[in-house]
Amino acid sequence: MATLFIADLHLCVEEPAITAGFLRFLAGEARKADALYILGDLFEAWIGDDDPNPLHRQMAAAIKAVSDSGVPCYFIHGNRDFLLGKRFARESGMTLLPEEKVLELYGRRVLIMHGDTLCTDDIGYQAFRAKVHKPWLQTLFLALPLFVRKRIAARMRANSKEANSSKSLAIMDVNQNAVVSAMEKHQVQWLIHGHTHRPAVHELIANQQPAFRVVLGAWHTEGSMVKVTADDVELIHFPF
């Protein structure tokens, strides 16, 4: 058996091929797992659990079917879907996790997270993140009419795209000191995260020992998952 990790699907109605690929994954590989962990940015945007978008209902039903089959499903918020709430989690059978979680997997201590908190060189983004994660601001936003939230979200995505176009790739990647600090805080030798869309397995030193950082790929033209078994930790890409 294996535990599976995915992230950064950025599901939206404009990308039906990715949605179809995810549905096949849920009906196939996911059903064989010990557990499924979704490490954020499952959706391209999330403006509230009350959004009647048919895609959201379709995904809730598909994930719930996996959960009902006996495979526990877990979710860590990403920077795109940080407002995903308890209602959708209940409808999809997912358990919401904190932004950093340590798992005991087949004899390994593994830290999992979305990964955006590791990009500490991107000062502008971290300031924005701190602002939009204020509970009072989220409560205020979610109280707005749905059409207003849609307009605000569209404007924020446009601003983010414009800002990122002028940033260096290095700034938008993780900071190595932040990586080591997180791994040493949690006393782990394995870290799995997404966010950067730069799939790779990196070797480093943490806790004065060899350590590994496994980065999930985004689901653009193919699927990406990390498969953890008693024998191995594999970063796997597969066609939709």
UniProtKB/Swiss-Prot annotation:
Chief place where the protein resides: membrane
Entry's cofactor comment: Binds 2 Mn(2+) ions per subunit in a binuclear metal center.
GO molecular function annotation: manganese ion binding; UDP-2,3-diacylglucosamine hydrolase activity
Binding site for Mn(2+) 1: D8, H10, D41, H197
Enzyme class label: hydrolase
Pfam families for this protein: Metallophos (PF00149)
Disulfide bonding pattern of the chain: none
Gene Ontology CC terms, in alphabetical order: cytoplasm; extrinsic component of plasma membrane
Keyword Glycosyltransferase on entry: no
Membrane association type: Peripheral membrane protein
CDD domains, alphabetized: MPP_YbbF-LpxH
Cofactor(s) the record lists: Mn(2+)
Compartment(s) where it occurs, according to its Swiss-Prot or TrEMBL record: Cell inner membrane
Biological process (GO), any one: lipid A biosynthetic process
Reaction equation(s) it catalyzes: UDP-2-N,3-O-bis[(3R)-3-hydroxytetradecanoyl]-alpha-D-glucosamine + H2O = 2-N,3-O-bis[(3R)-3-hydroxytetradecanoyl]-alpha-D-glucosaminyl 1-phosphate + UMP + 2 H(+)
Binding site for substrate: N79, R80, D122, S160, N164, K167, H195
InterPro entries cross-referenced by the UniProt entry: Calcineurin-like_PHP_ApaH, LpxH-like, Metallo-depent_PP-like, UDP-diacylglucosamine_Hdrlase
SUPFAM superfamilies for the chain: Metallo-dependent phosphatases (SSF56300)
Binding locations of Mn(2+) 2: D41, N79, H114, H195
Annotated EC: 3.6.1.54
Pathway the protein acts in: Glycolipid biosynthesis; lipid IV(A) biosynthesis; lipid IV(A) from (3R)-3-hydroxytetradecanoyl-[acyl-carrier-protein] and UDP-N-acetyl-alpha-D-glucosamine: step 4/6
Primary role: Hydrolyzes the pyrophosphate bond of UDP-2,3-diacylglucosamine to yield 2,3-diacylglucosamine 1-phosphate (lipid X) and UMP by catalyzing the attack of water at the alpha-P atom. Involved in the biosynthesis of lipid A, a phosphorylated glycolipid that anchors the lipopolysaccharide to the outer membrane of the cell.
Similarity annotation: Belongs to the LpxH family.
Listed name of the protein: UDP-2,3-diacylglucosamine hydrolase
